Regions:
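Non-transmembrane alpha-helical segments in soluble domains
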Residues: 61-64, 156, 183
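Active-site metal-binding loops of divalent metal-dependent hydrolases
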Residues: 12, 175-176
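Structural beta-sheet core signal
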Residues: 8, 171-172
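Phosphate-handling substructures
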Residues: 67-151
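Generic structural signal for well-ordered alpha-helical scaffold segments
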Residues: 32-39, 153-161
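A structural signal for well-ordered alpha-helical segments within the folded catalytic domains
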Residues: 32, 54-58, 150-153, 176-180
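Active-site-proximal alpha-helix that buttresses catalytic centers in soluble enzyme cores
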Residues: 1-86, 138-146, 192-215
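Acidic, low-complexity terminal tails and accessory targeting/binding regions
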Residues: 1-3, 69, 82-104, 158-169, ...
Length: 220
């Protein structure tokens, strides 16, 4: 097993979390500036991955534009491990959106009133910090914070295997629940909501050990 470096970043600014929303114009500018900073600091090949949603894809595309060295970049590539937590409601996988009506939209034939009658999801949607509320739940209807942290740890270690990303900085554009889960597993404390296009730098050692620390490419 060799060593690997991964930079996990939250997606760019969005106007809301009401479904699969786009990144704002300001968010795209921020992401492109971040890509430029990454390209200047790395001075070598980069891979850019994203977590399935429109906002992570648009952020990843802007980062690639900022790096401005297409011959040295793999991506953007959709990476399944970077998806939001797998959560379930009435037999359907749902994303953790901001209101009962947006949950109901994800489940065939479900009503907003039925979501509101679900004790767990009613607690989630009414919490001032929804992701913080989920982090504290030991047995949610889906992946827990620890489950997500383990997923990311295994994903990160896999980049030490010989393959197309060997010797590259791997930029992983994802979502705040994943970043907060990873950092919480490292420090035993919830770091709070990360800023847009900030996150964590992960180094994988030759024996598979992980070193994880908060990181902002524009303020390293």
């Amino acid at each position: 097993m060799s060593e690997a470096r991964l930079l996990f970043l939250r997606h760019g600014e969005v106007a809301s979390h009401r479904g699969d929303v786009p990144v704002t114009d300001a968010g795209l500018v921020h992401a492109e500036r971040t890509g430029k900073a990454i390209g200047a600091s790395v001075g070598g090949p980069v891979s850019v991955l994203y977590g399935g949603t429109r906002r992570t894809r648009e952020t990843a595309e802007a980062i690639v534009r900022g790096i401005d060295a297409s011959e040295a970049v793999i991506g953007p590539v959709d990476a399944f491990a970077l998806r939001n937590p797998d959560m379930y409601l009435a037999g359907s996988r749902v994303n953790m959106v901001s209101a009962p009506e947006f949950l109901a939209e994800q489940v065939p034939c479900m009503t907003t009133q039925q979501v509101e009658a679900n004790e767990w999801w009613a607690g989630f949607t009414s919490a001032p910090d929804r992701i913080g509320w989920w982090l504290a739940q030991e047995d949610p209807p889906g992946e827990s914070s620890r489950d997500v942290a383990r997923r990311l740890e295994r994903f990160a270690r896999s980049f030490a295997d010989p393959g197309p990303h060997s010797g590259r900085l791997v930029v992983c554009v994802t979502h705040s629940p994943l970043l907060r889960s990873m950092l919480r597993a490292t420090t035993d404390e919830d770091p709070g909501e990360p800023g847009y296009v900030t996150g964590a730098l992960v180094r994988v050692g030759p024996a598979g050990q992980l070193h994880i620390e908060p990181h902002d490419p524009l303020d390293p």
